[in-house]
Every structure is written in C-alpha cells, then in structure tokens.
Regions:
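DNA polymerase processivity clamps
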Residues: 1-103, 122-244
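Long, charge-dense
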Residues: 110-124
C-alpha cells in the first residue's frame, strides 16, 4: 500500500502526539479509527479506503513508536498480521525493499473505549474551513505562544450577512488576543463560547491539505470539525472549556 495513506491516517488521529492508544478496525480494505484525547476534550474518527490489510481489530498502544517505524520505510509498504493459533493478532509487520519491521500489538482491553457523541439535531453556526482559515489560526496561535483558549461567536456584518468571529487568547481582559473573521451561516445567533486552543491547532495542522473542511458549532458547547483529504474522512468533536 501507499505509505502516504498510512501516514495520513496516523496524522489524523495522532495529532502530533496528543493521542497514542487506539483500536484500528479494518473491514473490506477500509480502516476506521475512533479516538479520544487523554483530557477528554476531543473525540474523533478517521476513515480511509485503500487500506491493504485483512479484516481485523487491532490495538496500537504507542502510536509514537509505530510512527517512527513507518517513517523510515519507502513509499510502498506491505502490511501483514501475524496471529496466534487462536487467530488473535499478535504483531503487524511492515516490509519494503529495504526493511522488514515488526510492531507488537496491544491487548484491546488496554485501549480506552471511545464514547459515542450525542450530536444536536442541528448546529447554531456553520462555516467552511480552507487553507486561509488554517493559516490564520495557526499563525495567531504561534504568535501568542502558550495560550489555552480561543472563543467563537457570530456577528452581523454591515451588509446583513453573518461572520464567525474567532478570538485566540486567554479570557481575562488584560491578555493579548488576536481576532479574525470568516463568513458563516447562523440562523438564531451564537454567543461567545470558549474552546481549547492547543487541540484545535493540532486538528487544523493535521488537516492542512484537506480539500474540504467544515466547522459546526452548537450553543450547548460542542464544535464539530470535519475534513476530506484524498478519500480520507476525519471528524472531530471538540468540547467547550468550562467557565473559570
């Protein structure tokens, strides 16, 4: 299989080291990975076709370690499972024209169960995410350094349209902040809601090459972020920060 497919799937859930332990579910050459951050502030799912591994459910306990193995491989990688006599997957092998690598799999009982998200019937605001949005957010976050939150709200424009207003920076009045806007659709309005900035930045960086991106926000404090990139669908549910 194409190494790029494998690394893209890893990027979508690993989020630069934010998520380590996951269960891979492979069926009919399609992989589905559900995941949750250790802080429980983000739940997500990555789905990719063209994943050349037999139908199975396997535990990847240390994605950092697995990623290091994948990185040294050539562009085409052959994945195979080694199983016990009872058919339990024990290890995954990776092979190219240089290396034969073995990665031992985790007991699935050691992988945290990912909860289902109770989505609202409709969201209160919706906006597209493009490369400009991603660039503005990541540049602002880098400029401000170790800020922990960003807020979103909607705002009426001069021509009676709606903008989504994103403010990156801490909540107190004396903190440095950076604000930018993007067009949005909002039926009933959206008052200011705080979300974790670090996790949002990693989500955007992991999907900076996406051809399709969308953000949907519920006033109840849930943000849904979805992307499509080269056939890979990734969905993230970000939970609001509690009021200080």
């Amino acid at each position: 299989m194409n190494k790029q497919t494998l690394t893209s799937v890893l990027d979508k859930y690993y989020l630069n080291g934010t998520v380590e332990s996951v269960k891979w579910v492979i069926k009919d050459k399609t992989i589905t990975v559900d995941f949750i951050t250790p802080m429980k502030n983000l739940v997500g799912k990555a789905i990719s076709p063209n994943f050349d591994l037999e139908d199975s459910e396997i535990g990847i306990y240390n994605t950092s370690q697995f990623y290091k193995l994948v990185k040294i491989m050539n562009d085409t990688v052959v994945l195979k499972l080694n199983k016990s006599e009872r058919g339990t997957p024990l290890e995954i092998t990776l092979a190219d024209n240089q290396y034969d690598l073995n990665y031992y799999l985790s007991d699935l009982n050691l992988i945290e169960t990912v909860p289902s998200i109770n989505e609202p019937s409709s969201y209160d605001a919706e906006a597209n995410i493009d490369s400009d949005f991603i660039s503005k957010f990541t540049n602002a976050k880098k400029a401000l350094g170790d800020v922990k939150q960003f807020t979103v709200k909607d705002e009426l424009t001069d021509d009676k349209m709606k903008d989504l207003v994103i403010v990156i920076g801490e909540g107190n009045g004396y903190a440095n902040k950076i604000k930018f806007k993007t067009p949005c659709e909002s039926m009933f309005g959206l008052t200011e809601i705080p979300f974790p900035a670090d996790v949002m930045m990693e989500v955007l960086k992991a999907n900076e090459d996406a051809t399709n991106g969308k953000i949907q926000i519920s006033q109840e404090g849930l943000m849904k972020i979805s992307f499509t990139e080269d056939g890979i669908d990734s969905i993230y549910y970000l939970v609001r920060l509690s009021d200080q």
